[in-house]
Amino acid sequence: MQTRNYLLYDVFTTERLAGNPLAVVLDCKGLDTIAMQAIAREFNLSETVFVLPPDNPKHKNRIRIFTPDYEMPFAGHPTVGSAIALAELAGESGAGIFVLEENIGPVRCAVSRHDGAAFAEFDLAKLPEPLQLEADPQAIGAALGLAPHEIGFENHRVAFWSAGVPYVTIPVANLEAAGRIRLDNQAWSELAPRKSEWAFASPYVYCRETVNHESAFHVRMIVPGTPSYEDPATGSAAAAFAGAIMHFDAPTDGISQLWIEQGLEMGRPSRIRLELTVQGGKLASARIGGHAVKVADGKLFI
């Protein structure tokens, strides 16, 4: 039996018991995929990260990301949380830049102190791209319990985007409509595109109206399943959402930063920072950033 240390962080927040929880299991050399999946199921968090030595010695670590049911090629809150956890573990309290190896590819991360708390941001390894969506937007709205007039605002329309993980981006009229969504799993399974052989793409609902004045968008992300569940902060969805922002809002050339609020309806308020660099009217690069705070640590006897 081997002892392995783990850390528990709340990500995309500066407050404990808010944001999106993440388990980071250290020293995972020797663990196979089956064991990692079983441990992730034991933690039963939205994601668990397993830290391994890097394939490239110039990089900091390799990480593998698991939900309780499957491995993911990339996810935002595990990247932010892992970057902060590994920097703090190494005693790196100042600014630092390093690369984490994920299944999607190398991810460049920067860790610093921001607003008095640890803050990490990473460059998207893959820029968002539009995918074909065959489902009727009104049917998508109905699967969320919304009327046709509540779907869309300004020039924003239902779309399908991916920056490694695909999401159906669904604009709704206002906060009241966003607060009423209830996913009908049966209806969703009949119309939603798949993100993999075993899972449907998740709906990412957003509106321009926000609770916090510094936020640019209010969002909710529901993971379909039996039962479905809500995610308090979803970095990979924010990465995909960058495509919708570029397509519908057409930001001018330069660097723009905006905050996305999520998790308020479920009592886990979260804030995700999205940075867009636009050149010649096209998205040249994008970054996802956020805070994280350590909540607990412990040992696994596996």
UniProtKB/Swiss-Prot annotation:
One of the record's GO cellular component terms: cytoplasm
Disulphide bridges, residue numbers: none
Record EC number: 5.1.-.-
Entry GO MF terms: isomerase activity
PANTHER family with a match to the protein in the record: ANTISENSE-ENHANCING SEQUENCE 1, PHENAZINE BIOSYNTHESIS PROTEIN
Keywords: Isomerase
Family: Belongs to the PhzF family.
Active site: residue positions: 47
Protein name (record): Uncharacterized isomerase mll1393
Class of enzymatic activity (EC top level): isomerase
